């Protein structure tokens, strides 16, 4: 099987090109220069004033991060300067990038906050050399995952079919049967893992030709240089004397102010530290690690049932990164004994996996349910899929920062379409759209300004979305037609676009008299 994995990996690498990496996604900045901060009387300044001074003195921190396409071009130029020729394929740069990182003994990364579900999630952006290394490590993980249909990040069709296939197999094998399921979600996924776990997995399955590359790449992962936002710097400077009971925060603040420990420079936004893995960076590799645990526990459960109870159960597992599920069908009607044994089997994996750094979140897991399983935020009750539309509806009234009203309407309509796709009825979508309209007009000040009545009159005469009028769908097709159809209806049935309509209705005559023709054509 190792020869087959090696052939598949080489084939995938051969089809890789610079276009797959040279995207418009962000790349990390260089971490060569420390942050310039003059002595400030922070007690006399607000946090925002401190922030403005830092941004003024450090222009590079304010600039947008370079795009991957620009970073790839710069890296190719460096390769050409050092090697004396241009790379013919992206894989030629892989050993060169890995050697540079191994000599540096770390890699650079930027960290920033991304709003998500009412809070912030940390997002990490790797430097371009590490991005190339990471891509090929993940590529090998994808090659292996394709041979395990239970892994859903590389086999997305499994998410929709695994419940149906399980019940189909159970019906064909048994006249009557009972099905017990487990929906498990792991907690602290990136904090609990270390790349040594993944290295041990690769040592068992990777071809000998790829082991040096994979092990050296994963050995780099614990050693990082992180650049965090300057907003955190201004917050620390403003609250240097604030009393805090957290020893971790106090240690971080002390090392920040003295330039010791993880900080190489005083009052800097660059730290060097050791940790396991980053959120989302080794996504497929961690999913493969979880697949190893799930598939082994499936074999173990089947063997226990077969040897101890003389039963051949139908067992199905499914997992994708930190999310997992398991279904066991045994012959006969449900009894207390069969339920107790099945739940013990389902709980077994959660107890064993703690020794492999996969910790089950009790709050987000349901173990031992009968004919009911949740996976990827979708509930399956036998052949029926139950989708929680609340997760989309709750996002419908989130307002994004836009420069034009029409952009806001497109975002609103896009989220509304997701509600419809997630299982909401057109009536629900119509009510959500009315709430979006109310929120939009409230943000314009219609509930507080004296000029609201006059604006109502103007909008009734000229419902122009570019001026703030909120277009709505027909109730029967809410979330279906889109903004373009809304604009078409406004153009056709209202005064909106009357000037454009008049211009389009003006036709040029095709008939000319002799007087209209020039002398040369008479």
Regions found by a protein language model. Give the residues of each.
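Viral RNA-dependent RNA polymerase
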Residues: 1-522
């Amino acid at each position: 099987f190792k020869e087959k994995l090696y052939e598949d990996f080489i084939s995938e690498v051969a089809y890789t090109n610079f276009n797959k990496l040279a995207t418009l996604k962000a790349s990390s900045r260089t971490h060569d220069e420390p942050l310039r901060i003059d002595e400030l009387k922070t007690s006399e300044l607000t946090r925002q004033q401190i922030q403005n001074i830092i941004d003024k003195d450090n222009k590079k921190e304010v600039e947008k991060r370079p795009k991957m396409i620009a970073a790839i071009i710069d890296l190719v130029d460096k390769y050409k300067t050092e090697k004396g020729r241009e790379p013919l394929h992206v894989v030629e740069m892989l050993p060169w990038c890995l050697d540079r990182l191994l000599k540096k003994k770390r890699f650079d990364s930027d960290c920033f906050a991304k709003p998500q579900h009412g809070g912030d999630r940390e997002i990490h952006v790797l430097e371009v050399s590490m991005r190339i290394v990471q891509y090929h490590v993940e590529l090998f993980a994808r090659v292996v995952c394709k041979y395990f249909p239970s892994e859903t990040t590389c086999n997305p069709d499994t998410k929709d079919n695994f419940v149906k296939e399980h019940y189909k197999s159970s019906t064909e094998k048994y006249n009557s049967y009972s099905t017990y399921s487990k929906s498990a979600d792991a907690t602290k996924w990136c904090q609990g893992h270390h790349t040594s776990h993944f290295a041990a997995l690769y040592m068992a399955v990777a071809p000998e030709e790829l082991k040096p590359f994979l092990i050296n790449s994963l050995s780099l992962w614990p050693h990082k240089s992180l650049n965090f936002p300057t907003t955190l710097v201004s917050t620390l400077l403003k609250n240097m004397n604030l009393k805090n009971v957290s020893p971790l925060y106090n240690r971080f603040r002390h090392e920040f102010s003295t330039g010791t420990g993880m900080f190489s420079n005083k009052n800097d936004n660059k730290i060097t530290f050791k940790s396991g893995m980053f959120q989302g960076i080794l996504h497929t590799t961690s999913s493969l690690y979880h697949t190893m645990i799930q598939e082994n526990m499936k074999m173990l459960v089947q063997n226990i049932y077969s040897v101890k109870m003389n039963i051949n159960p139908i067992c199905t597992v499914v997992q994708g990164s930190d999310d997992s599920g398991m279904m066991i069908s045994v012959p006969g009607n449900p009894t207390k004994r069969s339920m107790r044994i099945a739940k013990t089997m389902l709980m077994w994996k959660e107890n064993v996996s703690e020794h492999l750094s996969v910790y089950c979140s009790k709050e987000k897991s349901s173990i031992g349910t009968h004919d009911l399983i949740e996976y990827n935020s979708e509930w399956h009750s036998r052949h029926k899929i139950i989708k929680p539309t609340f997760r989309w509806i709750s996002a419908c009234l989130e307002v994004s920062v836009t420069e034009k009203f029409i952009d806001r309407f497109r975002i609103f309509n896009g989220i509304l379409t997701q509600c419809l796709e997630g299982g909401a009825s057109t009536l629900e979508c119509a009510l959500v759209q009315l709430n979006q309209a109310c929120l939009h007009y409230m943000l314009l000040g219609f509930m507080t300004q004296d000029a609201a009545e006059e604006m109502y009159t103007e909008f009734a005469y000229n419902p122009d979305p570019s001026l703030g009028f909120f277009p709505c769908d027909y109730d029967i097709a809410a979330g279906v037609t889109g903004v373009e159809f809304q604009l078409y209806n406004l153009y056709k049935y209202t005064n909106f676009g009357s000037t454009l309509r008049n211009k389009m209705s003006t036709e040029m005559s095709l008939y000319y008299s002799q007087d209209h023709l020039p002398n040369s054509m008479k």
